[in-house]
Curated annotation (Swiss-Prot):
Protein task: Tetrapolymerization of the monopyrrole PBG into the hydroxymethylbilane pre-uroporphyrinogen in several discrete steps.
Molecular function in Gene Ontology: hydroxymethylbilane synthase activity
GO biological process per UniProt: protoporphyrinogen IX biosynthetic process
Pathway(s): Porphyrin-containing compound metabolism; protoporphyrin-IX biosynthesis; coproporphyrinogen-III from 5-aminolevulinate: step 2/4
Name of protein: Porphobilinogen deaminase
In-chain residues carrying the UniProt-annotated modification S-(dipyrrolylmethanemethyl)cysteine: 240
Family, as annotated: Belongs to the HMBS family.
Catalysed reactions, as listed in the record: 4 porphobilinogen + H2O = hydroxymethylbilane + 4 NH4(+)
InterPro entries noted in UniProt: HemC, Porphobilin_deaminase_cofac_BS, Porphobilin_deaminase_N, Porphobilinogen_deaminase_C, Porphobilinogen_deaminase_C_sf
Pfam families per record: Porphobil_deam, Porphobil_deamC
Keywords, alphabetical: Porphyrin biosynthesis, Transferase
Encoding gene, per UniProt annotation: hemC
EC identifiers of the protein: 2.5.1.61
Subunit (UniProt): Monomer.
Amino acid sequence: MPLLRIATRKSLLAMWQSEYVAARLRMLRPDLDVVLVPMSTRGDEILDRSLAAIGGKGLFLKELELAMLRGDADCAVHSLKDVPMDLEPPFMLAAVLSRDDPADALISNVYLSLESLPIGARVATSSLRRQAQLRFYRPDLRLFDLRGNVNTRLAKLDNGDYDAIVLACAGLRRLGLEQRMTARLAPPEWLPAPGQGAIAVESLTEDARIGTLLAGLDDLPTRQCVVAERTMNRALHGSCHVPVGAYASYEVGGMRLQGLVGCVADGRLVRAELCSAKDEGDMLGRAVAQCLLDAGAAELLAATA
């Protein structure tokens, strides 16, 4: 029986996502023996500093990529929003699965919406993109960094450390925690991270056998949307150091891409959106990035450089 080894982080969410991919592969190939290879990453272990301060979201990938290079794993499963915009050779995104809910969720045990939070409320999130949008809509809020897995973050909220926290809806749904969502923060008013809500499978470019196996998981509409989002971010030279949001969706007549660049310090947001009748995510992403730059995003990007 052919064997396929999936490298995965050890968190409950990462294990859920990897087991989901494994189950899909077993359905496609009943003759395939799919096993998980759990491991810790530096991004999981260093929790007392922001991601921007310790090297970015690529820290969630490095150990998994090394396992593939050593021959200890054949592929790795990630939340696509955690995958750097430019994967360095010899790695590629072999599959992007159908997207789940791309929105963020406000979670509070007392208050029912972002608008109902009291003046000066304590809201925690590690994402600069979320912080910038919070600052735009509620400049009075006190914002805090919050790292760790989903249950760790919820526990800090439940212990009274904060009045509210912001997490991704998709992660909560995958863990069966939908009931913790107080309010959805969703497009068009609130933009997610590029690729948010999608699961990605990474493999070695040169491994044609694995690439062919994983291609059966790929969802073309999702891939085309996230290509537009990630291209926009790449054209802006965005990273976890920069508050960038993007969301592409199919509508009657083609694809719409909405983008924003923000500033945590003063809550400024620069927005742009365009539609394309063609499935040209790269072109649409570059066009929206240029619109953002023309509208003043360059100043915000320079301020965070």
